[in-house]
Amino acid sequence: MPELRQEYLDILEKREWSVSGYTDDGCVELEWWSPAGEDFLVCVNVENFPDEILNYSDDFDPDEHIEMWVEARANGRQDVPGARRLAKDAEDIQKELDELAFELQEAERKL
């Protein structure tokens, strides 16, 4: 089962991400706590990890993320913050993903 390079693990740790685990199909599950307290999980392939994170960042849709949580709140979930906080948090998540992708791409160039 492939695992992440130490250089990538160091970047994740510095940015307060943790590895939750590896899957049998070659993926890694990452966990990060957003400023609003969301337990944000990302699952990507270990192979070409920097590109996988870049693609995830490019595909992340803050509006879709906000809508998911607004719907959860409408369906009775109690721990969802208000719309303004959700909007700010989605922006913060996008920023974190972009910065993480950039740092990983830079590390990849140096290898």
Please provide the spans of the model-predicted regions.
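Negatively charged, low-complexity tracts enriched in Asp/Glu with abundant Ser/Thr
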Residues: 1-37, 74-77, 107-111
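Long amphipathic alpha-helices with heptad-repeat character
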Residues: 5, 83-86, 90-100, 104
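Compositionally biased amphipathic helical and low-complexity segments enriched in hydrophobic
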Residues: 10-13, 55, 87, 105
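Generic local-structure boundary detector
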Residues: 23, 41-43, 53-55, 97, ...
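Intrinsically disordered, low-complexity regulatory segments enriched in Ser/Thr/Pro
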Residues: 36-88
